[in-house]
From Swiss-Prot:
Disulfide bonds: none annotated. S-adenosyl-L-methionine binds at residues 76, 78, 99, 115, 139. SUPFAM superfamilies: S-adenosyl-L-methionine-dependent methyltransferases. PANTHER family: RIBOSOMAL RNA METHYLTRANSFERASE, RRNA METHYLTRANSFERASE 2, MITOCHONDRIAL. Keywords: Cytoplasm, Methyltransferase, rRNA processing, S-adenosyl-L-methionine, Transferase. The gene is rlmE. InterPro entries: RNA_methyltr_RlmE (IPR050082), RNA_MeTrfase_FtsJ_dom (IPR002877), rRNA-MeTfrase_E (IPR015507), SAM-dependent_MTases_sf (IPR029063). This is Ribosomal RNA large subunit methyltransferase E. It is found in: Cytoplasm. It comes from the Bacteria. It catalyses: uridine(2552) in 23S rRNA + S-adenosyl-L-methionine = 2'-O-methyluridine(2552) in 23S rRNA + S-adenosyl-L-homocysteine + H(+).
Length: 235
C-alpha cells in the first residue's frame, strides 16, 4: 500500500496466477475509487448512482409523481436514485427499467430483461409505462470492438435509438438524459434534440472518471413535436 499524489493511501494488486494486466489495473482502480467505496456504504449498486445524483441535484428533473424509463439499467444504480426521487416505492411515481443483463429487484421499479435494440422492445416499454414518460434516461454503452471508428458509430447509433424512443414517449416538458462519449452527441443528433427540446447541453459529473471520455447529453423541456412520416408520392 502506498500514497498517491493527494496523500491518500493507495492499494496495489500483486499479480497472481494468470491475472491479465488489464484485469489487475481494473481491480486497482476499483479498490482505489472513492465513489466505489461510497456506493457500498450508501447501499447503491454502482458508482454510476452518483452521476445521476449530481446531474439531478443541479437540474432537478426527477420529481415526485413522475414516470421514468431507464434504458440499460443494470446493475440498478440509476433506477435506485430515480425510484427514490419520484416516489416509486410508495406508488407516487413509476420507474420502468430494461437491460440485456439480469437485475435484482428494486422497490418501486418494474424491470424486464430486454435488448433495447430488439424490434419488440419499444412496444414492450410503452406497454410497461402504460402511458407517456416524463423522463427517459440511458446509461447504455455499446460493446467495444477496439476499432475506434466502429465503436464510435455503435455508440452514436445507440444514443440515437434512445433519443428516437424518447421523442415517441415523452410528455410535453419531459427530459432525456443519455451517456455519450468523446466529443459528445454528434451534429445530427444535436440538431434533432435542439428542435425537440427547449434546452440541450452536455454535462460531465464529478463522479465520471477524469480519464474517461464519458459525458452525458441532457435535453429538457420536450416540446411534444410529433414525428412526421415521410410523404409518399403517387405516380
Amino acid at each position: 500500500m502506498a500514497k498517491d499524489t493527494t496523500g491518500r493511501m493507495r492499494v496495489t494488486v500483486k499479480s497472481a496466477g494468470r491475472m491479465k494486466l488489464s484485469s489487475k489495473l481494473w481491480l486497482e482502480r476499483q479498490l482505489n475509487d472513492p465513489y466505489v467505496a461510497q456506493a457500498k456504504r450508501d447501499g447503491y449498486r454502482s458508482r454510476a448512482a452518483y452521476k445521476l445524483l449530481e446531474i439531478d441535484d443541479k437540474y432537478h428533473f426527477l420529481k415526485s409523481g413522475l414516470a421514468v424509463a431507464d434504458l440499460g439499467a443494470a446493475p440498478g444504480g440509476w433506477s435506485q436514485i430515480a425510484a427514490k426521487r419520484v416516489g416509486a416505492p410508495d406508488g407516487r411515481g413509476k420507474v420502468i427499467a430494461i437491460d440485456l443483463l439480469e437485475m435484482g429487484e428494486i422497490p418501486g421499479v418494474t424491470f424486464a430483461q430486454l435488448d433495447f435494440l430488439d424490434d419488440a422492445a419499444p412496444d414492450r416499454l410503452r406497454e410497461m409505462l402504460g402511458g407517456g414518460a416524463d423522463v427517459v434516461m440511458s446509461d447504455m454503452a455499446a460493446n467495444t470492438t477496439g476499432h475506434r471508428k466502429t465503436d464510435q458509430l455503435r455508440i452514436v447509433g445507440l444514443v440515437e435509438s434512445a433519443a428516437q424512443f424518447a421523442s415517441e414517449v415523452l410528455k410535453p416538458g419531459g427530459t432525456f438524459v443519455a451517456k455519450v462519449f468523446q466529443s459528445g452527441a454528434d451534429a445530427t443528433l444535436m440538431t434533432q434534440l435542439k428542435r425537440d427540446f427547449a434546452t440541450v447541453k452536455h454535462v460531465k459529473p464529478a463522479a465520471s472518471r477524469k480519464d474517461s471520455s464519458e459525458r452525458y447529453v441532457l435535453a429538457m423541456g420536450f416540446r411534444g413535436v410529433p414525428i412526421v412520416a415521410p410523404e409518399t408520392v403517387d405516380e
